[in-house]
Regions:
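Phosphate/pyrophosphate-binding catalytic cores of soluble transferases and nucleic-acid-acting enzymes
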Residues: 1-296
Length: 296
């Protein structure tokens, strides 16, 4: 079994390439998309069609209702299930989608982040507090380790303000995710900015032809509380249109294109800064490198 990730911005062609290669090279696909996990969000998420989902085994698709919670820890479980299935059945695992944060967490793990709290205490005073309340944590660093002392105090303050009396070390043990993926080959589809904008415009128009507004209308009627997935690019703007905040469909399409391009820019920046060891190239270039990797 070989594992690889195909990343890139929205509208870069990740899904199509993953489907093509997974069908040719005995693969399964793990969706790296925070919207595809939800049922009923089909057009807005550019989810593979029913025929495409039937062509290749998929994981991470249609798991939850739009008002249900999904987080990176749950994604880890889906990844483990997909990997075990691929290993058991002698298949290759293709990971693809636009949620680069999930991929980064698979490779590097995840530690909770907390707001900095000014203690007004010296290192020695904090260390004395740590030693008395959390000797397990204190045993791992010196009294001069300013960074870890501050980190401990930040978490300690968070727990106390939440009415919890558990030790910081116990909290971290339960809430820190260790890396679960290694030796993962990463391929990034890259496009010229103007070409990508044209693709975004074309895809947005196609989504409207497929019934994006009808999908949005049904979702907002079913979930008037507007859960987080309904605030994603595409659905959020459609909601504004349906409420009369956006006056014309032309304006709506232009707004979705603009916000999608902004999302693509953020995705591109994240992928470039977080994944140093990867191959970046055109769709054709990446396809050739992936085939070379799979045959190697």
């Amino acid at each position: 079994m070989k594992e690889l990730a195909i990343i890139g911005t929205t509208a870069s062609g990740k899904t199509a390439l993953a489907l093509k290669l997974a069908s040719e090279f005995n693969g399964v696909i793990l969706s790296l998309d925070s919207l595809c996990v939800y049922k009923f969000i089909d057009i807005a998420s550019a989810k593979p069609s029913a025929d495409e989902l039937a062509l290749v085994p998929h994981f991470g698709v249609n798991l939850l209702m739009p008002d249900e919670h999904f987080d990176v820890g749950m994604f880890f479980d889906v990844y483990k299930t997909a990997r075990e299935f691929a290993q058991k059945n002698g298949k290759n695992l293709f990971i693809t989608g636009g949620s680069g944060f999930y991929l980064k967490a698979l490779l590097s793990g995840l530690t909770p982040k907390f707001e900095r709290v000014e203690s007004g205490l010296s290192n020695a005073q904090i260390y004395e507090l740590v030693s008395s309340l959390d000797p397990e944590f204190a045993a791992k660093f010196s009294a001069n380790d300013t960074y870890r002392l501050q980190k401990w105090f930040d978490i300690y303050s968070f727990l106390r303000s939440s009415g919890r009396d558990e030790a910081v070390s116990a909290y971290l043990r339960e809430n820190t995710l260790a890396p679960v993926a290694s030796n993962l080959a990463i391929f990034e589809l890259s496009w010229d900015r103007d070409e990508l904008r044209a693709r975004i415009k074309e895809r947005t128009r196609a989504m409207f032809e497929q019934g994006l507004l009808d999908e949005a209308r049904e979702l907002f009627a079913r979930y008037p509380q507007r859960p987080k997935p309904l605030n994603s690019v595409g659905l959020k703007e459609c909601g504004g249109f349906l409420r009369g905040e956006i006056k014309t469909q032309t304006e709506l399409e232009e707004l979705i294109c603009t916000h999608t391009a902004q999302l693509a820019k953020r995705q591109r920046t994240f992928n470039r800064s977080q994944f140093e060891s990867k191959f970046s190239g055109s769709v054709k270039g990446c396809e050739g490198k992936i085939i070379e990797f799979l045959k190697g």
